[in-house]
UniProtKB/Swiss-Prot annotation:
Protein name per the record: UDP-N-acetylglucosamine--N-acetylmuramyl-(pentapeptide) pyrophosphoryl-undecaprenol N-acetylglucosamine transferase
PANTHER family on file: GLYCOSYLTRANSFERASE, UDP-N-ACETYLGLUCOSAMINE--N-ACETYLMURAMYL-(PENTAPEPTIDE) PYROPHOSPHORYL-UNDECAPRENOL N-ACETYLGLUCOSAMINE TRANSFERASE 1
Gene3D superfamilies to which the protein is assigned, alphabetical: Glycogen Phosphorylase B
Family to which the UniProt record says this protein belongs: Belongs to the glycosyltransferase 28 family. MurG subfamily.
InterPro entries: GlcNAc_MurG (IPR006009), Glyco_trans_28_C (IPR007235), GlycoTrans_28_N (IPR004276)
Species in which this protein is naturally found: Bradyrhizobium diazoefficiens (strain JCM 10833 / BCRC 13528 / IAM 13628 / NBRC 14792 / USDA 110)
Principal subcellular localization: membrane
KW Cell wall biogenesis/degradation (keyword) present: yes
Lineage, top ranks: Bacteria, Pseudomonadati, Pseudomonadota, Alphaproteobacteria, Hyphomicrobiales
Superkingdom of source: Bacteria
Length: 366
């Protein structure tokens, strides 16, 4: 109904930002609200809750490096996006704007501040992202996936609520699938993913690790791996040579179901991936993406590693030999895999969308 309150959801155009926004959108629609997504052009390729007529694209730019021309261009682009978002907000009259991180959230959340519309941000990482850090003093409320993210900042901790990471219906369905450890000498299902954009490091390391496994394990292995198009031929050649049952693809649209159907996952440790591993309860070997200013992926992986739900391997230590050793050890210990799955599940939270929706409704004054 056009008369029902509208809530704008703002997110960067990658899965880690979009999927929690989609999960909140599902819950808000269930409660009778209207929702629209404000994002960048990358989001148009994602299927899911948001059809194209529910998406508003505003210009944004990631501020990279210290080149003064790049910084100036990013600033001008974000300013133009803010003006566009302000016009959008005045036209649509939302009761709240909720941001999920990424530079495309800056224009709508800054515009909301100027327009007097309540703003809320959600951050799924163990440390606040750069865009959310900038917005943190400009919004009414902050929601985090993990406890303690802002405990050391008294100016922000008072308006911070820990809610967890909102999960899409597909993840909730996968979370209902119990973990069944591989039987001795039975099939071992291994899933290798590298994040929403794929990861060359997996193509460089994993085939060599599989080669180093005992031949008896080759016959047990059922491998599913995310591989970029440019790496496909060389990766497939290794698995064909070893006669490994392998499904390779640049992207999997049904990743939650695949997480649920595998015995072990090798992955980067983006916030969304870690949250889904915890919600579904699957053991993993996590390789944090290095080089980020805040080392957010290292901290994310630590959430599961600290409870023995995952093995965290820094990229400097991520070699074919090391990975082969870890896979071999886990394959020989089904009970350990079961314990890891239970530990990961214990770190998950399935009611985050409801909790975040409660916060949004409260901040909007409804």
């Amino acid at each position: 109904m056009e008369t029902s309150p509208l809530i704008l959801l703002a997110a960067g155009g990658t899965g880690g930002h979009l999927f929690p926004a989609e999960a909140l959108g599902v819950e808000l629609i269930r409660r009778g609200f209207r929702v629209r997504l404000v994002t960048d052009e990358r989001a148009l390729r994602y299927s899911g809750l948001f059809s194209k007529d529910m998406i508003d694209v505003v210009s944004s730019e990631t501020a990279r490096g210290r080149n003064p021309f790049q910084v100036a261009y990013a600033g001008l682009t974000l300013a133009a996006g803010t003006l566009s978002a302000y016009s959008l907000i005045k036209r649509l009259k939302p009761v709240a704007v909720v941001g999920f991180g990424g530079y495309p959230t800056l224009p709508p959340l800054v515009a909301a501040k100027f327009a007097g519309v309540p703003g809320i941000i959600h951050d799924a990482n163990a440390v606040l992202g750069r865009a959310n850090r900038f917005l943190s003093s400009r919004v009414r409320a902050i929601a985090t996936s993990l406890p303690g993210v802002l405990d050391r900042d008294p100016a922000l901790s008072g308006k911070t609520t820990t809610v967890g990471t909102p999960m899409r219906p597909a993840v909730l369905a996968a979370a209902a699938v119990p973990y069944a450890a591989p039987e001795a000498n039975g099939p071992l299902r291994l899933l290798v993913v590298g994040g929403s954009q794929g990861a060359r490091i997996m193509a460089d390391i994993v085939p060599g690790a599989i080669e180093r496994l005992e031949p008896a394990l080759w016959g047990r292995l059922i491998l599913t791996q995310q591989v970029r198009d440019e790496d496909m031929n060389r990766v497939r050649a290794v698995y064909d040579k070893l006669k490994i049952k392998a499904e390779l693809a640049p992207f999997f649209t049904d990743l939650p179901a695949r997480l649920a159907s595998n015995h072990l996952v090798v992955s980067r440790s983006g916030a969304g991936t870690v949250a889904e591993l915890a919600a579904i309860g699957r053991p993993s070997i996590l390789v944090p993406l290095p080089g980020s200013i805040d080392q957010d992926q290292f901290a994310n992986a630590g959430v599961l590693a600290k409870v023995d739900g995952a093995i965290r391997i820094p990229q400097t230590e991520f070699t074919s030999d090391r990975l082969a050793s870890e896979i071999s050890a886990l394959a020989a210990e089904p009970a350990r895999l079961t314990a890891m799955a239970a530990a990961a599940k214990g770190a998950g939270r399935l009611d985050a969308a409801e909790r975040l929706a409660d916060l949004v409704v409260k901040v909007a004054g409804l």
